[in-house]
């Protein structure tokens, strides 16, 4: 069976892993790292940049560089008004749906499309690593993601050309990685604080069985929020000192955000850090700079409300699992934000024990996803995973009340039914309004979709029997069926309308992505050929200039032709005539080989012993060009 990869599609960084020889392995990306920034950018000429190369140019191209897009996936505009104000790139409301504005392409993107580009980059790296085409994946999502966010993540996978075999909760994936070889039963708490989301799950782990007892979380709390606190502090300090604001300067905001993230990371191991941003802006009085010292104490003071928010899901998860802190055997930290000293202290204070730091918080989720991928492909045996639904599911009933059909923390997959009736005499149809959440009234919960069951026979209210069935699959995605028991008529809905993209739009994006993939591949090949030709021109000129005089005199025609070919090739490179570049590159390679053979036959060394070193660096230089595609 073809390899199935596990992907941690993160807010800040993403990771891909695979089972090899029965062991999970994190795949190194084309830049040589194991984590790929979840950043996508479009250059002025329309080129697509993904990962580290996109992140590096964010300051000079802030309006066309998209990051932390996971915070928007599967969510309507009204839910993310706070986040909209924090991004240097523009976000538009398109009939209640979020669209990311890209001025360089004069185009708007759905969050799913941007996430799909990150997935495509991960899969391309996996293809190169494995030497085969990857078409199937397990993708992780925060445990507290609702139905629409899960469906949107599947859509992103589809747009990227992937068959998403399973959506798995991030803390559950982490527990798989932690507990793969554990024989003794343990109760573990996974504390997962990533770039944009926070989850807490409590599990029973041991002897191949992973049972989730409870889960809680906050999908609007993560490392980005800690960065934002530092940014606000820097903005306020600057405004106090300079008497004008940087809030409308997207380039300055991007530099501040990057500096804030760097400072946060440094404070994980230092007691204080320096933030230096020269030439952040200028006015009539000249250039302005930011020079600030941020101490660990000041950082904790700025973020005190965020640390308080971290407590609530831990307490809720313990309550739902009916456990006391001393009944937790191990605490596993997941996500880069758990490196913050105050977070570790918070965990220790709540649970009364030092957290387990034996797993890599950046890679553990992808490793768990790879294990689940191995289970689905038959490569991993004797693993039983029992996950839960994070939020209650139900329908709206008379008076706008939410009637729960599947309570939160129910093990999935699951199927449950309830009988409902009509509210008025001779009611010909019923509208089923599907809801997700814990609040009493429908208006306070997340609306997942509505559908109508027609053809109910005339009868006094309360007489017709309408059976509503909720069916949650292993991905945590819901389908709902309503059946009139009297007529056997039924109507159903798979809650995919909760995604921000209709099915037809997803299909269109899949086709566009496939077309662009071919174009991107061709563009990448052209860049490689152009770089190679440029290198050969340099080598040829250097080699010819260092030839012994006697050899030059004996081969004047060959030397002249070689020089002419170099000039033609340079002209081809300038005009980006790739067919001619390939043609003349081949000619130049042949002529250089002929010169080399004649020099070797003469057994006369070149003037400069280092002349061959340019050739020996061929692979290194080419790899450098490959990195910057």
UniProtKB/Swiss-Prot annotation:
Q: Which UniProt keywords apply?
A: ATP-binding, Chaperone, Chloroplast, Nucleotide-binding, Plastid, Stress response
Q: Where do Basic and acidic residues bias regions lie?
A: 601-612
Q: Which Gene3D superfamilies does this UniProt record tie to the protein?
A: 3.30.420.40, Actin, Chain A, domain 4 (3.90.640.10), Substrate Binding Domain Of DNAk, Chain A, domain 1 (2.60.34.10)
Q: Which CDD domains match?
A: ASKHA_NBD_HSP70_DnaK-like
Acidic residues: compositionally biased ranges: 619-629
Keyword Oxidoreductase attached: no
Where is the major localization of this protein?
plastid
Residues of the region (Disordered) are 599-629
- One annotated Gene Ontology cellular component of this protein: chloroplast
* Localization (cell): Plastid, Chloroplast
Is Metal-binding set as a keyword in this record?
no
What NCBIfam families does the record tag this protein with?
PRK00290.1 (NF001413), prok_dnaK (TIGR02350)
| Function of the molecule | Acts as a chaperone.
HAMAP family to which the protein is assigned, alphabetical: DnaK
What is the official name of this protein in its record? Chaperone protein dnaK
Organism this protein belongs to:
Diacronema lutheri (Unicellular marine alga)
Lineage of origin: Eukaryota, Haptista, Haptophyta, Pavlovales, Pavlovaceae
């Amino acid at each position: 069976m073809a390899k199935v990869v596990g992907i941690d599609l993160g807010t800040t960084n993403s990771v891909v892993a695979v089972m090899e020889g029965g062991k999970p392995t994190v795949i190194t990306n084309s830049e040589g790292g194991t984590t790929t920034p979840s950043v996508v950018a479009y250059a002025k000429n329309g080129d697509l940049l993904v990962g580290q190369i996109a992140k590096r140019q964010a300051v000079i191209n802030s309006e066309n560089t998209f990051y932390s897009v996971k915070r928007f996936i599967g969510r309507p505009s009204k839910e993310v008004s706070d986040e909209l104000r924090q991004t240097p790139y523009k976000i538009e409301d398109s009939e209640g749906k979020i669209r990311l504005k890209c001025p360089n392409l004069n185009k708007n993107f759905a969050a799913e499309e941007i996430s799909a580009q990150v997935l495509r980059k991960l899969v391309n790296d996996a293809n190169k690593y494995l030497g085969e085409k990857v078409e199937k994946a397990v993708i992780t999502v925060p445990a507290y993601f609702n139905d629409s966010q899960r469906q949107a993540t599947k859509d992103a996978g589809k747009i990227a050309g992937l068959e998403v075999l399973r959506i798995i909760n991030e803390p559950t994936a982490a527990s798989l990685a932690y507990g793969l070889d554990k024989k003794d039963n343990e109760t573990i708490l996974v504390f997962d604080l990533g770039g944009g989301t926070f989850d807490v799950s409590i599990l029973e782990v041991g002897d191949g069985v992973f049972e989730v007892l409870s889960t809680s979380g906050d999908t609007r709390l993560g490392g980005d929020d800690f960065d934002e606190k530092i940014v606000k502090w820097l903005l306020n300090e600057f405004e106090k000192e300079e008497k004008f604001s940087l809030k409308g300067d997207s380039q300055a905001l991007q530099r501040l955000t990057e500096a804030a993230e760097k400072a946060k990371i440094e404070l994980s191991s230092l007691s204080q850090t320096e933030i230096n941003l020269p030439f952040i802006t200028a006015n009539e009085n000249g250039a302005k700079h930011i020079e600030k010292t941020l101490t660990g104490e000041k950082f904790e003071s700025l973020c005190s409300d965020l640390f308080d928010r971290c407590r609530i899901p831990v307490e809720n998860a313990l309550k739902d699992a009916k456990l006391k802190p001393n009944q937790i055997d191990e605490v596993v930290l997941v996500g880069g934000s758990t490196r913050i000293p105050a977070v570790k202290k918070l965990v220790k204070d709540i649970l009364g024990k030092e957290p387990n730091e034996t797993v890599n918080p950046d890679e553990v989720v992808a490793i768990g996803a790879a294990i689940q991928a191995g289970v689905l492909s038959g490569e991993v045996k004797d693993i039983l995973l029992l996950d839960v639904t994070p939020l209650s599911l139900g329908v709206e009933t008379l008076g706008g009340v939410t009637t729960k059909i599947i309570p939160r923390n129910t093990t999935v997959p699951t199927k449950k039914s309830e009988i409902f009736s009509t509210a008025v005499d001779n009611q010909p149809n019923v509208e089923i309004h599907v809801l997700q959440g814990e609040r009493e009234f429908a208006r306070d919960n997340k609306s997942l979709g509505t559908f109508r069951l027609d053809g109910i026979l005339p009868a006094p209210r309360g007489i017709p029997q309408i059976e509503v069935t909720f069916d949650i699959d292993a991905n945590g995605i819901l389908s709902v069926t309503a059946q009139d028991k009297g007529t056997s008529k039924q109507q159903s809905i798979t809650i995919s309308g909760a995604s921000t993209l209709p099915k037809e739009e997803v299909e269109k994006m899949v086709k566009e992505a496939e077309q662009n993939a071919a174009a991107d591949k061709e563009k990448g090949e052209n860049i490689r050929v152009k770089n190679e030709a440029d290198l050969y021109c340099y080598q040829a000129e250097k080699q010819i200039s260092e030839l012994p005089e006697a050899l030059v005199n004996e081969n004047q025609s060959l030397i002249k032709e070689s020089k002419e070919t170099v000039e033609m090739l340079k002209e081809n490179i300038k005009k980006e005539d790739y067919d001619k570049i390939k043609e003349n590159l081949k000619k130049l390679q042949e002529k250089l080989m002929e010169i080399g053979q004649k020099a070797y036959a003469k057994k006369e060394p070149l003037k400069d012993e280092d002349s061959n070193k340019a050739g020996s660096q061929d692979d290194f230089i080419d790899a450098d060009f490959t990195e910057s595609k």
